[in-house]
Structure formats: structure tokens, C-alpha cells
Amino acid sequence: MKEKLESLVTEMIDRRIYLDEALNEFEKKFIQSALTKTGGNQTKAAKVLGVHRNTLNRKVIQHKLNGH
């Protein structure tokens, strides 16, 4: 996994993708994966992600996931 991450980071730097954009995309994909794994259940997804349900809900809205 470390090698894949290093390769991805190098590619993003070469493409001049800024840290804010990279972090935003990572967070969005991470949340979407947790929601998919839990069948869209935000309470379960929040537990999987280790965040409070309200925090997850705010991020779902922020990233326009699940129809928001």
C-alpha cells in the first residue's frame, strides 16, 4: 500500500494537483466507500470512519454525496 500511495502522490505532484484538492478528493472517496459498504447508512458509516454521525452528515452535504 505504501508504494501505491507514493506513486499516487508523485503523479499528483507531477500533475500540479494542490494538497487541498487532493485531500478533498481523498475524503470524498473515503466517505463514499464507507457509505457504499454500509448500504448508505450514515450511522454505520460514521462508526466505520471513526467520526460522529453529525460530522459525517455535514461532510456528505459538503461533498454533495447521496443526492445532497
Language model features: what each stretch is:
Residues 3-6, 10-68:
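Bacterial C-terminal helix-turn-helix
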